Amino acid sequence: MDDLYLHFVQQLARYPFRKILLALSGGVDSQVLLALLARGRDEFGWDVTAVHVHHGLSPNADQWAQHCQRCCREVGMACQIEYVQLDVASGESIEKLAREARYRVLAPHVNAQTLLLLGQHADDQLETFLLALKRGSGPKGLAAMAAYAPFAEGHLLRPLLTVSRQHIEAYAKQHKLTWVIDESNADIRYERNFLRHQVTPVLTERWPSIRQAVQRSAELCAEQEALLQEFLAEALKKAITAEGGLSIAVLAEGSEGMRRQLIRAWFAHHRLPMPSRQHTERIWCEVALASEDANPKLKLNHIEVRRFQHCLYLVPPEKDLSGWRSALVPEQRLPLPQGLGHLQLTSKAGGNIKLPDDPSQLWVSFEPQGLEACPVGRVGSRKLKKLFQEYGVPSWRRRQTPILMYQNRVVCVADLFVDRDWSGQDCELVWFKSHDSVPK
């Protein structure tokens, strides 16, 4: 069985690292990795540590954590326990919640010189491929799990991805390793367990080389996806605006398939979950192609797709701030609601606002309804609704833009204009905005 150690060493030799972090679950896969790492550390002087994620889902979770610490002590390796809590009432699958929680707590341990080792093997890859096939995935999903991929500030490696579960268990038994068994692994209500117990045994008995065939298909899908993304990168540069929007005119130039892929690439650019095929079609038909006088929006999970001036935008759902108001004290920062940043009225020679005689009457609102103003350089007052349109403010930002008031009169609208009656050189209004990953 030394061929497994040789395979392991060869895998690690392909990639640069200064430190290795093992994700140690206590199962047979990660226990074999622990044994291989301990041997490699002694032979090559690797800097190795382990992290066990305690999900708290099983009554045996504490015992599993203790088992991992004990096994690490036996080989002289540090082991840290990370505790997570899962929102099991969220409606998401427990498998997905646990996976996301694991990656979330592992990420801070991985810097640019760290290689994170995960224990997935060839049978796991077969299951992942079949689950993607069941969902109707394209090349991205059918690429399944990558052997080597960026993670946090460093990279992750799955050195056993081409090794079968049978070979891993044989190695563990030969070397008298001990491991924990998650009792939930026998519950076929979970999709992966159903495949593991009732589907893949039939497939591997009929086609013994199916694991290798699936791995080849996954690699080909990954290659096709990489080529597609390389091609889309140039197209996206042309389609995306400086504000992060997506040009409808550019989308209209391409085929239906190109349009769909550009929309998906746009979501990826903003680090958002991929929209389904149905959702990309709805984005095009219901938002992009809506009538000119419409104000269309499509809500997808925790984001909305909106249209403004012939572009699509990804924005957080609108928050009703119509009832919010607060006094503004000169020289003091005013925290704004819903993560919109801070406001400060700052004394400044050469500013653009005249300070009123009674600054205690200054206040801030987000409600433009019924208000009028006459920007400096203009003649005659206009409704704020019309002024927002003239200044090119998207509809979803109009009730998230601070309005500085004096009694019942508009002094200025942050980052847009000062009313001519309040033009002066005493001070200026500064809006310190929060920087979100999704454009507003």
UniProtKB/Swiss-Prot annotation:
Keyword vocabulary terms for this entry: ATP-binding, Cytoplasm, Ligase, Nucleotide-binding, tRNA processing
GO biological processes: tRNA modification
Disulfide links within the chain: none
Pfam families: ATP_bind_3, TilS, TilS_C
The protein's Enzyme Commission number: 6.3.4.19
Cellular location(s): Cytoplasm
UniProt cross-references to Gene3D superfamilies, sorted A to Z: 1.20.59.20, HUPs (3.40.50.620)
Name of the top EC class for this enzyme: ligase
Subcellular location, principal: cytoplasm
A single cellular component GO annotation: cytoplasm
Nucleotide-binding found in the keyword field: yes
Source domain of life: Bacteria
CDD domains per record: TilS_N
GO MF, any single term: ATP binding
Reaction equation(s) it catalyzes: cytidine(34) in tRNA(Ile2) + L-lysine + ATP = lysidine(34) in tRNA(Ile2) + AMP + diphosphate + H(+)
Residues annotated as binding ATP: 25-30
Record flagged with keyword Transmembrane: no
Task performed by this protein: Ligates lysine onto the cytidine present at position 34 of the AUA codon-specific tRNA(Ile) that contains the anticodon CAU, in an ATP-dependent manner. Cytidine is converted to lysidine, thus changing the amino acid specificity of the tRNA from methionine to isoleucine.
Family designation: Belongs to the tRNA(Ile)-lysidine synthase family.
Domain notes: The N-terminal region contains the highly conserved SGGXDS motif, predicted to be a P-loop motif involved in ATP binding.
NCBIfam families in UniProt: lysidine_TilS_C (TIGR02433), lysidine_TilS_N (TIGR02432)
Name of the protein in its database record: tRNA(Ile)-lysidine synthase
Species of origin: Vibrio cholerae serotype O1 (strain ATCC 39541 / Classical Ogawa 395 / O395)
Gene name of this polypeptide: tilS
